[in-house]
Amino acid sequence: VHTTASDGKYQPREVVRLAAGKGITSLAITDHDTLSGLQEAQAECSKYGLKFIPGIELSTSYAEKEIHLLGYNIDRTSRSLNAALTELQNARRHRIEKMVKKLADSGIPITMQTVQSKSAGSSIGRPHIALVLKELGIVKTIDEGIKNYLSPGCPAYVPRYRLSPFEAIDLIKEANGIPVLAHPGISTPLELIPNLINYGLQGIEVYHPKHTADQIVFYLHFIADTAKSLLITGGSDFHGYEKTDYANFGAMKVPLRSLRILKSYRPG
């Protein structure tokens, strides 16, 4: 689940209230490359009796593919993780500034100030630009804005500094967390996964709104055949901007074994 700390629509406390209203009993906040929403979310979860799982979603790159690593039950005071996040946030902002300039130079009435106003947190990203494009009537959805204007091959695209997935695993483990490969069906090369497992990956997000039924079956079989010890996880990837977000919120499956481990995990 994402909040205004990165590219979500709702503040951490609002996301918790939405979750409670849906009868959700456990909630993981995994904002992109930031920890800034965790304290507020944890306090609100305590009020509503929800089990809170502090997390993060780290943006990484491998063979020109964007790979995301989820970290669950992380220690948000980790020095190494916070130092890396500061570097990532600075690089992220410089990239967004360049993208906004390209769009403005093409004649689109967009400014960095307007984009910044869409982010209430420390993390600013492409969805904030896409939201402005949507409000200007240039695109109909956030996904369309990212796909048609802000992705590789598009006029306003700017590559960004990223960690490697192996560096992300190290950072998550140094923060006493559980590293999980996020939505591999979107862009993760299959040949990379065994290398990540050998390096210390502990789970795969099998259930995700953008995974097809065939992909879900494939990853379930992959885990059963090659790495039975891997956690099978799932997430709504809730951002709050599209109608489908609300249908998916709380609807993704998480095996009971995995949920118990995520809830109770303590580093050995």
Locations of the language-model features?
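An N-terminally biased module of ancient metal coordination in phosphate/nucleic-acid-related enzymes
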Residues: 1-65, 149-155, 167-176, 180-182, ...
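Extended substrate/RNA-proximal surfaces in nucleic-acid metabolism proteins
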Residues: 44-194, 253-265
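Acidic, metal/ion-coordinating pockets
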Residues: 268
